[in-house]
Amino acid sequence: MESFSSKSLALQAEKKLLSKMAGRSVAHLFIDETSSEVLDELYRVSKEYTHSRPKAQRVIKDLIKVAVKVAVLHRSGCFGPGELALATRFRQKLRQGAMTALSFGEVDFTFEAAVLAGLLVECRDILLELVEHHLTPKSHDRIRHVFDHYSDPDLLAALYGPDFTQHLGKICDGLRKLLDEGKL
C-alpha cells in the first residue's frame, strides 16, 4: 500500500516555496527587526571583507534560508524529543557564542579568534545533527557555508580590528538586545 501524508507533502511544499523566496519579505515573517539589523551588518562585514557583493549576498541568503527552514520544521512539530534536546543545545551554544562575541567587543584586548571560531563550529555541528534527517544535502551545504564563512579566523580578526569598529558596535548592540529580550 502506498504511504501518503498530506502533512508531509505540505511541509515539503512549504520548504520548497520558502527556498525559492528567501528574500526580505519572507524573512520578515520569521526574522524580527533586531535580527534583520544584525543580518544587515553581517552582510556589510562579509561584503567589505570579501570585496564581493555576490559572495556576501550568497552567505546571507543561505543563512536566511536555513533559519527559515529550521523555524518551519520547529513550528510544524517535526522534531522528536532527541532532536528537541539538540535544538536546546544549539540555542544554548548560540547564546554562549553571542555572549562571547559581546564580551570580546566590549572588553579591550580580550578577543581570541580561536575561541569564537570554535563556538561557531560547535553550533554548525549541532545544527547539522539536528536537521540531518529533515533537510536536503544542499541545505546541509548551506549550513556549512554560513558557519565556515563566519568562523574564519581571518574574518573574525578583521571584524574585531580597527577597520570594522562601526560594524562590530552595531552587531554587539543587536546581540545585546536579542539577549535581553530572550530571543537568543
UniProtKB/Swiss-Prot annotation:
The keyword Ubl conjugation appears for this protein: yes
Pfam family, one: DUF758
GO CC entries: cytoplasm; lysosome; nucleus
Induction: By TNF in fibroblasts.
Superkingdom of the organism of origin: Eukaryota
Taxonomic lineage of the native organism: Eukaryota, Metazoa, Chordata, Craniata, Vertebrata
Function, as annotated: Acts as a negative regulator of innate and adaptive immunity by maintaining immune homeostasis. Plays a regulatory role in the Toll-like signaling pathway by determining the strength of LPS-induced signaling and gene expression. Inhibits TCR-mediated T-cell activation and negatively regulate T-cell function to prevent hyperresponsiveness. Also inhibits autolysosome formation via negatively modulating MTOR activation by interacting with RAC1 and promoting the disassociation of the RAC1-MTOR complex.
Domain description: The central region was initially thought to constitute a DED (death effector) domain. However, 3D-structure data reveal a previously uncharacterized fold that is different from the predicted fold of a DED (death effector) domain. It consists of a large, hydrophobic central cavity that is poised for cofactor binding.
Keyword Ubl conjugation attached: yes
Biological processes annotated in GO: innate immune response; negative regulation of inflammatory response; negative regulation of T cell activation; regulation of apoptotic process; T cell activation
Key words, A-Z: Cytoplasm, Immunity, Innate immunity, Lysosome, Nucleus, Phosphoprotein, Ubl conjugation
Protein name: Tumor necrosis factor alpha-induced protein 8-like protein 2
Record gene name: Tnfaip8l2
The record's account of how the chain is modified after translation: Phosphorylated by TAK1/MAP3K7; this phosphorylation triggers association with BTRC and subsequent ubiquitination and degradation. Ubiquitinated in a BTRC-depdent manner; leading to degradation mediated through the proteasome pathway.
Annotated family: Belongs to the TNFAIP8 family. TNFAIP8L2 subfamily.
Gene3D superfamilies reported in the protein's UniProt record: Tumor necrosis factor alpha-induced protein 8-like
Phenotype reported upon loss of the gene: When infected with lymphocytic choriomeningitis virus (LCMV), TIPE2-deficient mice exhibit significantly enhanced CD4(+) and CD8(+) T-cell immune responses compared with WT mice. TIPE2-deficient NK-cells exhibit enhanced activation, cytotoxicity, and IFN-gamma production upon stimulation and enhanced response to IL-15 for maturation.
